[in-house]
């Protein structure tokens, strides 16, 4: 019974990734229609990546459940070790293309936290589908003590390094903390912004329209390391401003699709991809499934 419940929830994480890549059109991003601003990956590359990561999603939630009473840092280390194996498997499946590195990191923590939370709230194991927004908040808050050390541990000694990953370079140049920062703050972009917005949208619109509007909203607020890496601070600010204007227009679904298709070509021409917003889109979908919003 326990394993079946954990399996079903881990499959919601996979489903969230499938929904994210399938949502179309998504400016600058891989979707059903085209590869966005990416020359090295396609819709099928994402499918390959998700299949490779799927067994690890199960391992993350089972680890959180099994070690719920363990000291938080020890649980984090277990999840990170699994996450590193998952990353290697992903790169093998994609021939070295980075499809889900940051999202895998976040999913490892959130699925681990979900497992730990379920171990402490056994009624959810027998009444699956009863997740509330308070449950979501509690799960995200569990990540905060697990990752409180992370910025200092991973990014605090970069002055001794000669070569940086692009995430490290963003921190050194702009102070952008990326997925580490989001995790160490308890995923407040999710709990305070993305999910409240989506709960409102889904109560007023059909699911796909709500998802497209959520993407636009995220692109208007997220500190997007992918955009900054590709185009710099000004390009990122420009995308945010454009998306704020698009939100203010309150377009019909048909006109919104047309606007996003047009903006897709704009971002392709600039080689810009809002990958940070895409990751948070997938994470929002995961909790939307838990809360039965979708």
Swiss-Prot record:
Pfam families in the cross-refs: CitG
Catalytic activity: 3'-dephospho-CoA + ATP = 2'-(5''-triphospho-alpha-D-ribosyl)-3'-dephospho-CoA + adenine
Coiled-coil annotated spans: none
Keyword Nucleotide-binding: yes
GO biological process, one term: prosthetic group biosynthetic process
EC number from the UniProt entry: 2.4.2.52
InterPro entries in UniProt: CitG (IPR002736), TriPribosyl-deP-CoA_syn_CitG (IPR017551)
Keyword field: ATP-binding, Nucleotide-binding, Transferase
GO MF annotation terms: ATP binding; triphosphoribosyl-dephospho-CoA synthase activity
Keyword Nucleotide-binding recorded: yes
Record-linked PANTHER family: 2-(5''-TRIPHOSPHORIBOSYL)-3'-DEPHOSPHOCOENZYME-A SYNTHASE, TRIPHOSPHORIBOSYL-DEPHOSPHO-COA SYNTHASE
Similarity field: Belongs to the CitG/MdcB family.
Entry-linked NCBIfam families: citrate_citG
Name of the protein: Probable 2-(5''-triphosphoribosyl)-3'-dephosphocoenzyme-A synthase
Organism of origin: Streptococcus pyogenes serotype M5 (strain Manfredo)
